Amino acid sequence: MTVGARLRSKAESSLLRRGPRGRGRTEGDEEAAAILEHLEYADEAEAAAESGTSAADERGPGTRGARRVHFALLPERYEPLEEPAPSEQPRKRYRRKLKKYGKNVGKVIIKGCRYVVIGLQGFAAAYSAPFAVATSVVSFVR
C-alpha cells in the first residue's frame, strides 16, 4: 500500500461523512436520496401548514432544515449611494509607484550623461592626440 493510499484511508476512517453527499452511499443512491428528502420535506411542510406548527418544531432541535429567507421591499424614496468623484490626485499606491520609477529614470539619465561626457572627452583626446604628437615632433625636428 502506498503512502497516499494509507493516508487517505486513515483520513476517511477518522472523518465521519454525513448527508446525501457522504461516502457511505453509492452514486445512484445519492441522487435518489436527495430527491426523496426534498419530497419528504415538502410533505412535512404541507402537514405543518394544515396543523399550524412548523416543520422545524416537529423534527426537533439539532436537526438540519431549510432556511427561510425574508425579502424586504425598498422604500419609495430610495436614493442610491453616490460614489465619490474621482480626485484629481492619483491614488497613494500609484503615486508611490511613479516616485519609484522617477527615481530609477533619474539615475539612468545621470549615469548616461556621465558616460556620454566621458566618451566625448575620450573622443576629443583621441582626435587631438595626433596633432599634439605632430606639433611636438615638428618642434623637435627644428
From Swiss-Prot:
Record keyword Chaperone present: no
Keywords attached to this entry: Membrane, Transmembrane, Transmembrane helix
Transmembrane segments: 116-138
Record's subcellular location: Membrane
Protein's membrane topology: Single-pass membrane protein
Cellular-component GO terms for this entry: 9+0 non-motile cilium; membrane
Keyword Membrane carried by entry: yes
Pfam families per UniProt: RDD1
Region feature (Disordered): 1-32, 46-66
Main location, first listed in the record: membrane
Record InterPro entries: RDD1
GO biological process: regulation of response to drug
Its biological purpose: Regulates drug efflux through modulation of ABCB1 localization and activity.
Protein name as catalogued: Required for drug-induced death protein 1
